Amino acid sequence: MTAALGPVWLRSGPVTLRPWTDADAPVVLAALHDPEIVLWNGSAVPDIAAAEAWVRRRADWSEGDHASFAISATAGLALLGSVSLHEIDPVQGDAEIGYWVAAQARGHGLAARAVTLVCRWAFAVLPVDRIELAHAVENAASGRVAERAGFTLEGRLRRSYRYGDGVKHDELLWSRLRGDGGSSTGVCGTRA
């Protein structure tokens, strides 16, 4: 766990990563029923109460083991996706990253930009030197995100994770190390 971790705003060009709010729950409910998101990110939330609980868990950084952001367009701040740094381990100096983008916002580079922003922020302010990204081999879009966000492919994990279809898929494991792909420039962070 990392002490004194609190929600921040991160901005880069057209993308803003912001703290979660209760107003995000209806969009989360719709997004987490998208078959693509359910397949690669787990089960759907059944109702608005579950979506509200999902948002509250991501908004609460008090345990210091995760940092979760709502992905939005800088103009308007409407919710377009999610990016989370989780399993933050300051002893080992590593963390994992995950994300999803709503169907209407896919194909515009939002996920890669969001992942890059979170990595730069994490390396600038957290005691982590390594961030891992894993995705099912069949999820080619996540491979493109990893490449664009400066991650290095490390290998294949055989039958390593049970995805939303109930099947254990092989995964590709990527990492980004402190010092890979530039510095923390271009990240504007402010406390929520």
Question: Where on the chain are the PLM-derived regions?
Answer:
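GNAT-family acyltransferases
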Residues: 1-104, 167-192
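Conserved catalytic-core motifs of GNAT/GCN5-like acyltransferases
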Residues: 20, 132-134, 152-169
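Conserved beta-strand edge residues that scaffold enzyme active sites
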Residues: 46, 69, 136-137, 160
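Glycine-centered small-residue hotspots that permit tight backbone geometry or close packing
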Residues: 65-68, 98, 109, 114, ...
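Conserved acetyl-CoA-binding loop-helix of GNAT-fold acetyltransferases
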Residues: 99-101, 107-121, 140-148
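Conserved active-site tyrosine of GNAT-family acetyltransferases
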Residues: 146, 151, 174
